[in-house]
Amino acid sequence: LADYIILAVPVKTAIHYLNRLEELALKETVLVTDTGSTKQEIMAVAQSLSFDFIGGHPMAGSHKSGITAVNASLFENAFYIFTDDTTQKKASRIHELKQLLQGTRAKFVQLAPQEHDCITGMFSHLPHIIAAGLVNQSQIFDDHFPEASRFAAGGFRDMTRIASSDPSMWTDILLSNQTLLLELIKNWQVQTSQVINWIQQEDFENAKDIRDHLPITDKGTLPAFYDLMVDVPDYPGVIGEVTTILGQEKLSLMKLKILETREDIVGVLQISFKTKS
């Protein structure tokens, strides 16, 4: 029988599996955890379980999915959040779980379920909704201006990249954090309405805050590029190694860009080509 069970599935599926596990003859000391992005709903279900459950959420991921997107250093130096009922028994079990996961080299943090969902709602879930909205709006825009997508600069791509994440996973996230997200979206509507009023009233004093944050570099438009994303560790010369390999294959680059870094451990190198092959 298993000592540990990790439910690395979308939130709603994890809840379903918890109920299924309750029907099975598990080891008395089994420790179950999940990797879902919301915690209040699943922790409420866990209160009635006969086995120990610790909520888990590694704050690392990729817009890519499937076995081909595997990354051995994915969790390294990323926050790994645990949620529990703060009892002494659970404290010892969290320590046990940290020992099990120490090979990930993640940074372990404990939060209350509500605190977790508020933080991730603001800094992860809401940005995803906004990114998805931008993608949808751009697709409608393309219907009127078929050439428009050719001129989408790097900033737009960076903002909307997360919208390509697994839709089934995000459906569960949005539904299980529904109340908070509705409040955040309404607050966002207030902010955008305020911007609309400033522009309509030509309120340049208030609009200055927005104007000051508009990019003043990378002016003009960019042609359509074909992008390759490469995970690179942080050490001197690593980008040179990548470009040397490409040069040996006589591949001409249009642009190099580091998309993300995590405390000097790993970055995503965006390599842009003019042609697809």
For the regions a protein language model found, what residue spans apply to each?
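N-terminal Rossmann-like NAD(P) cofactor-binding module of classical short-chain dehydrogenase/reductase
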Residues: 5-6, 33
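Glycine-rich, N-terminal phosphate-binding loop of Rossmann-like dinucleotide-binding domains
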Residues: 8-10, 36, 84
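Interdomain hinge/lid region at the active-site interface
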Residues: 144-211
